Curated annotation (Swiss-Prot):
One of its GO terms (molecular function) is rRNA binding. GO terms for cellular component: cytosolic small ribosomal subunit. It comes from Ruminiclostridium cellulolyticum (strain ATCC 35319 / DSM 5812 / JCM 6584 / H10) (Clostridium cellulolyticum). SUPFAM superfamilies: Nucleic acid-binding proteins. This is Small ribosomal subunit protein uS17. The lineage of its organism: Bacteria, Bacillati, Bacillota, Clostridia, Eubacteriales. The gene is rpsQ. Keywords: Ribonucleoprotein, Ribosomal protein, RNA-binding, rRNA-binding. It comes from the Bacteria. The keyword rRNA-binding applies. Belongs to the universal ribosomal protein uS17 family.
Amino acid sequence: MVERALRKTRVGKVVSNKMDKTIVVAIETSVKHPLYGKIVKRTYKLKAHDEENQCQIGDKVKVMETRPLSKEKRWRLVQIVEKAQ
């Protein structure tokens, strides 16, 4: 039996939940500037599948890589780490 490779997971903040069963998650990373060496924050957004429409804007969520679900959706919600205030 062939084992599947571990899927990527990311933790980010929900910035939009206006689509049905879809959330937009902003992921913040820190990278070192190639020339100056300063640590710079980079933010990128990805769309994730939220089957029960349970996320609200501001929630901290964990998403996992999955098969393509639509043109731009390749991630799905694993859990809500922290609810928004």
